Each structure stands twice: as C-alpha cells, then as structure tokens.
Amino acid sequence: MTRENIPTSNVPNVPPRILMGPGPSDAHPRVLQAMMSHMIGYLDKDFMLILDEVSALLKNVFMTKTNLTLALSGTGSSGMEAGLSSLLEPDDTVIICANGFFSERMIDMATRIGANVIALKSEWGEPFPPELLQQELANHSKVKLVTAIHAETSTGILQPLEDLSKLTKDNEALFMVDAVTSLGGQRVAVDEWNIDYCYSATQKCLGCPPGLSPAALSPQAHERIKTRTHKPVSWYLDLSLIANYWGFEHVYHHTAPVSMILGLREGLRIVLEEGLETRFHRHSKNASALAAGLEALGLS
C-alpha cells in the first residue's frame, strides 16, 4: 500500500477539550509529561523501586496501612473482574448490592464465573438500603462475598459503606467495593470501613488517562485467594500472580504498562501534594455549585 492509499481521519489532530463527562477527565499536564519519559524495562531494578513508590502512594490514597496495594493493567472493569474471579469459585455465594449500571455489570461477571449470585436490587438514584442486605444475610449462612458500588457513575449516588461493611463482617464474608469514581475525590477509608478488596480507575479523580485499575487487597482476601480449591478462571487477572509482581519478590507476570505507571505515580503525587481533605472539599464544593447552577437553569 502506498502512502497515498493509507486511510486518514478527517480530523487528524483533535483540538484540546475540557472533558466534563463521567470519564475520562482531563489528565494533568504533569502526568502527561511523566508519561513521555524514556522507556525502561518492567523488570529493571529502578522500575521495581517505582512500583514500590506507587504502592506506597496508593496506601495513602486508599487510607490503608495493612493492605497490599497495586495497579492492574486495564480499566476499572479489569479491577472488577479481577476481584470477582479471584475471590469467587464456582458455586460460591455472592450478594451484589445493585442500584445502578455498574452493579449490573458485577452481576453479569459473577454469573459467568459460575457463582451463586444473589442480586439485591434497589432503586437507581438512591443509596442502597442496608436493611435489604441484613434481611438477605439472615437467610444465607455461607455467603463468601458482598459487593457494593461506592460512587455509582450512572446515577452520581455516593453510597455510605459503614453499615454494609459491618453487616458483611458480622456474617464472616469478605467485602468488595467499587471506588472507580470516588478514589481521589471522596474519602475511601479502606481500613476504617473494613474493605477486603477495593478497586478504582485512573481516568477520573486521579487525573490520569484510562488504562490502570488501582486496587487494595486485605490480608484476609489475599489468604482467600491463596487457599482456593481451583485456580481463578482468568490467568491475566489472577490477583495472586499480580500481587507477586507488585509485592516484595517482584516475580514477572506480564509486561507492565511502564508509561501508564509513571503517569499514575505523578498523578498520586499531585493528589497528596494538594492534601486529601483539601481535595475532597474542593470536589464537594464544585459538585454542589454545578448542581445549583443546573437547578437554576430549570434542570433536575
């Protein structure tokens, strides 16, 4: 094929835009600059130090001291599927607190794994009521996992997690939380709320391009994975293998997205430079101002 015959876009250079949709958000210029750094091997000793730094930065943002923190190669859905496929075996019972689009995706994924899925559905646009979970847990003695969405992208609802977590722990199940939309913009207190597996994505409140799913894994969740009867159905999303790469031993699993990880490191630095509480306040203040402006226009 000659150069003249190569298909070209009618818009070869997309102009800069201010992104105001549900995601991705605009990437910080410092993040984009960091991603332009020269390439380095994913097993280079200096890159291992970068992984350790990213893990430490994630501990601060996830508000955890004991959890293993890492970033999966893929968007937030990879974090979702990694958690479900690693923590559930066929016929395990999982309760999914469903009040929006992405909890419906959880139901689909868990069903494909072969789990016994209990889909507790409540009204979209409203927080999930803890009493529904309490009633269902009273009817099932062998629930292995309970899942919830912290900030549901499809409706904008921020879900209180303390009551859901307590009910889950009182029934000796693991608690998995989707923080794709909230991490870096709202408080995500993994240790305080006893979350066993929490995952997010880089393209929203962390100010990075899409492509990584930061996650925090509790010792209890890690032990559940290590003592499985069968290997997870997904090799690529097996959290035990990914943890071996991000952990102390740094055992090769797959080719890590070096540039994305460099960008995430810079994005996390920016988050912590601003300060978590300051950042949370800014997001809440701006969200309230936007809502007030829309209501003033007669929108709801």
Where do the language-model regions lie?
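Conserved beta-loop-alpha segment that forms the PLP phosphate-binding cup at the N-terminus of a helix
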Residues: 67-99, 103-108
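Active-site phosphate-binding strand-loop segment of PLP-dependent enzymes
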Residues: 127-184, 197
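Active-site C-terminal subdomain of aminotransferase-like
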Residues: 26-27, 203-291
